[in-house]
């Protein structure tokens, strides 16, 4: 959502859908910039604000939007009612600021729809078993929309964004990136997890689990978007579907760890317990019974990662235990990689020819990701995009 004019525009589009005889649930996020403004205010008072209080604060943005959207619909003759995440029965675990949905009752949403009303639902939020407000993390409104669609068995789920679909790369980085008409859940999940900002990765994961077919489309026009669905046999004809760039990563080197069985498990269990997502892991055997571990984490998790590592290995913390530096991750994704060979060779050759040094590599069945110097990130994305001939209209 943007300003008041954007809310009016959304209301008009909802009216058209409602007038066509559909029951409509509209899941909304905070107005553009509001969440960042609230975070800024909080951190001006306390650089490390309490997670529970942050959840209470940040849900203000969505609650403002649901009320304004309902008012805008009333003004053009559409019966509408707003509902918070708690009123919709979106139950989560206790993890404030990054809660996971455990169940959805739907509250009275079905009754309101049957009564002929449009329901405006606050995205991004739910409530914990002890009744406290929780939030679902950045992009959580996508997850709310997918989850309520699954719970109520909706016929169609449309995700409206500031882009008109899923592209072979970020069009702001690769000018000739092309829009995909469809993409498999797995590919979308890998792209979302690799830096693509179109959708929250947990939302895609939820859609795949409950087989919610959805369309990513633009808020600003009526053009068809990208359908995200279960993999079709024809999708394997395309080896690579897209290239993702994530510049919000840090490379962490943990040095002089005890080189014995269980150390790695101990380290990564502790990081997981701290809610830190880890990727691209490399272990180097050191000397004299010591080993070094290198991995990547989101840049905003560096302080938490360091605190976790130092607390876990206090004896080693007297030396050069923890070092962090910026890194960029470029990933190629495609379900066709399962049945085609040579993808890694082509990727590495393209980067080598351009003089881009690879620091780290990670792979899955349908993804290859490389960690590189951030200064090379955008150039590398364009090079890889061209190497796999993605600059043509994809189907």
In which residue ranges do the predicted regions lie?
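Nucleotide/pyrophosphate-binding catalytic subdomain
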Residues: 1-204, 284, 296, 372-373, ...
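A broad, structural surface signal
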Residues: 12, 36, 71, 193, ...
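Short phosphate-binding/catalytic loops that engage adenosine nucleotides
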Residues: 22, 78, 212, 276, ...
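A conserved regulatory-domain signal marking ACT and ACT-like small-molecule sensing domains
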Residues: 45, 224-395
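Short hydrophobic alpha-helical runs that function as membrane-insertion/retention elements
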Residues: 156-160, 214-216, 279
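Acidic, glycine-rich loop-and-beta core segments that form the ion-binding/anion-interacting portion
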Residues: 173-178, 183-193, 198, 202-250, ...
